[in-house]
Amino acid sequence: MSDAIRPQPGILDIALYEGGKSHVAGIQNALKLSSNENPFGPSPKAKEAFLRSVHTLHRYPSTDHAGLRQAIAEVHGLDPARVICGVGSDEIITFLCQAYAGPHTDVIFTEHGFLMYRISALAVGANPVEVPERERTTDVDAILAACTPHTRLVFLANPNNPTGTMIGQADLARLAEGLPPQAILVLDGAYAEYVPGYDAGLALVEKRTNVVMTRTFSKIYGLGGLRIGWGYGPKAIIDVLNRIRGPFNLSTTQLETAEAAVRDQDHVARCRADNARWRVWLAEALAEIGVPSDTSMANFILARFSDSEEAEACDLYLQSQGLIVRRVAGYKLPHCLRITIGDEASCRRVAHAIAQFKRMR
């Protein structure tokens, strides 16, 4: 690279994001449990909408996403004027950093938090501030202690990825109330639908002017391949984000498929119930063979091994058995493997394989 042609400060500090592995060399039809995907896929109604959309591929999509915003608002009891849609919730995170962070500002997140928080902060030249967790769970006091007059954004995934842990409404409220006046709390609810009765921060958004929530269609809705997310917040903040959002950032196919998906809450309920059943089963099965995990509220568990060597060896053994899980050394958890909750057959298969691995140790 020429010394005269340089990227903005911070960009060269970004490590390339590595997604969950999809294939194992030499093994056909490996079972992928590495990306927290819904094993049942999208709603049949969403699939029908996807197929119908091919008839209008020559037309530009809506610029205001009115149909999808209205559907989201009706399902969740929101004001559609305060909903913004993006290419996954990642794009909403990027918008927030572009609009409210920059050089000489701080963006806070927890030590085992989603890697895109750091990446998005560095991309705008902001200072990423990582705060410690307490036994792989968000520590509100640590976040508040890290705040300074330079703090602009605080990102919190609840439930968190890759730990699966979460904090309650009282702690969320205490965090929002304790932030400095110039800071925005961003509640990332990518896995919120897996938690019965959890509003993902909606009550806080409605009561306060410094809280934004984000959601995704990639997890329980089974639309990871289409990349659709949304955010909800104070009107003033959403107005700012829409000013930097590309007018055609979502295709007609994305919009119509997501609208059908969010309206089919029966499918969501079935997926949530099945996930809860087999998440408990898998966690208990692994605990019985000496592989503990924290109580997860998402669609995965974080299996803990004695050390990084055992975790790596188990991962390699699982791959040899046609099972793909996720190493999380990049999240500072080298002794752990994150395992997506699949259907019954998948859960039984991975539990059996890990038991075999432990017997060979």
Swiss-Prot record:
Pathway assigned to this chain's UniProt record: Amino-acid biosynthesis; L-histidine biosynthesis; L-histidine from 5-phospho-alpha-D-ribose 1-diphosphate: step 7/9
Annotated S-S bridges: none
Gene3D superfamilies named in the record: Aspartate Aminotransferase, domain 1, Type I PLP-dependent aspartate aminotransferase-like (Major domain)
Name the UniProt record assigns to this protein: Histidinol-phosphate aminotransferase
Keyword Transferase recorded: yes
NCBIfam families xrefs: hisC (TIGR01141)
Organism from which the protein derives: Cereibacter sphaeroides (strain ATCC 17025 / ATH 2.4.3)
Taxonomic path: Bacteria, Pseudomonadati, Pseudomonadota, Alphaproteobacteria, Rhodobacterales
Catalysed reactions, as listed in the record: L-histidinol phosphate + 2-oxoglutarate = 3-(imidazol-4-yl)-2-oxopropyl phosphate + L-glutamate
Modified residues (N6-(pyridoxal phosphate)lysine): K219
Its EC number(s): 2.6.1.9
One BP term from GO: L-histidine biosynthetic process
Subunit structure: Homodimer.
Keywords: Amino-acid biosynthesis, Aminotransferase, Histidine biosynthesis, Pyridoxal phosphate, Transferase
UniProt enzyme class: transferase
Family recorded in the similarity comment: Belongs to the class-II pyridoxal-phosphate-dependent aminotransferase family. Histidinol-phosphate aminotransferase subfamily.
Cofactor(s) demanded: pyridoxal 5'-phosphate
Gene: hisC
Gene Ontology molecular function: histidinol-phosphate transaminase activity; pyridoxal phosphate binding
Pfam families per UniProt: Aminotran_1_2
InterPro entries assigned to the protein according to its UniProt record, in alphabetical order: Aminotransferase_I/II_large, HisP_aminotrans, HistidinolP_aminotransfase, PyrdxlP-dep_Trfase, PyrdxlP-dep_Trfase_major, PyrdxlP-dep_Trfase_small
